[in-house]
Regions:
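Conserved glycine-rich "GG(E/T)P / GGGxP" loop and the immediately following alpha-helix
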Residues: 143-257
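N-terminal start-of-domain structural block
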Residues: 136-138, 162
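Extracellular/periplasmic envelope-modification machinery, especially enzymes
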Residues: 128-136, 186-192
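Accessory C-terminal segments flanking Radical SAM cores
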Residues: 3-133, 140
Length: 257
């Protein structure tokens, strides 16, 4: 679907970006975050898109009424990485960064920084901003289209876990899914817990680690990859995840990651 990207101008050529160092984050230009059931995030710290990146909504268009279990979201078990990476949502998100906008969905990092802590935004900017800066004007003129596939992958291939860490959620841990389900049956589930459980239920049962389609795309794009973080669940509790990681290690690109 071709649509005008919110926050951009129809013809950016000849215009300059308006990057605000207090708000700019390199993450949407270099990294993608997957979840164990195939949905994705701009990064792990973002708020407001707990069900995944929507196919038909931009960030500013999301409301509690139109973002639900029925909302079409990208799922990398079936949708291509390329389609998600340069979706309207992602291009719009990048243009917000290039136009110097403050993005409320990024408030977790801003709260950390206000407390004197090093946020993910600061950490990733230190690693990637200098390298990415020369490319940003081109991305701006292309309304947020990035022609380099993700260089940093934050991958969750499954939610299979052997621990019940209380700070975790049912969408990330199979053990916490069981705990939340037990509390639901006992009538002890508070609204915030129930909301997290409902989202986890909507994700289905199949793990991303079972998707040959997704894994082939990762293997085909390793030449661009500099960093890979594998998270869970517990990564080593899921045999297909371990096998996939081993297969990456056997490639000629592993020495660069």
């Amino acid at each position: 679907m071709d649509r005008k990207i919110s926050g951009s101008i129809s013809d950016t050529k000849g215009h300059n970006m308006n990057i605000d160092d207090k708000n700019f984050c390199v993450v949407p230009f270099v990294q993608l975050n997957t979840r164990g059931k195939g949905d994705a995030r701009v990064c792990c710290s973002i708020t407001g898109i707990e069900r995944g990146i929507p196919k038909e909504l931009l960030l500013d268009e999301i409301t509690s009424e139109n973002y639900s279990a029925e909302t079409p979201v990208y799922n990398l078990m079936n949708d291509s990485i390329a389609d998600l990476w340069n979706s309207d949502f992602m291009k719009d998100f990048r243009m917000k960064m290039l136009n110097g906008e403050y993005i409320p969905a990024c408030e977790f990092c801003h709260r950390m920084e206000a407390s004197g802590l090093t946020s993910k935004r600061i950490g990733k900017n230190k690693r990637f901003k200098e390298k990415t800066l020369p490319l940003l004007q081109k991305y701006y003129e292309r309304n947020g289209h990035v022609d380099i596939m993700p260089q940093w992958w934050e991958i969750r291939l499954s939610t299979k876990c052997n621990l019940s860490c209380i700070m975790c959620t049912p969408g990330l841990s199979s053990m916490m899914y069981k705990e939340y389900s037990k509390w639901e049956k006992q009538g002890k589930s508070i609204p915030m817990m129930q909301g997290a459980l409902d989202i986890a239920k909507d994700g289905g049962q199949e793990y991303l680690s079972s998707s040959k389609f997704f894994k082939k795309q990762i293997m085909d794009n390793l030449e661009h990859c500099l960093f890979m973080e594998f998270r869970g669940g517990e990564v080593f509790a899921d045999k297909p995840s371990v096998k996939f990681i081993d297969s990456i290690g056997d490639t000629g690109y592993a020495k660069n990651i």
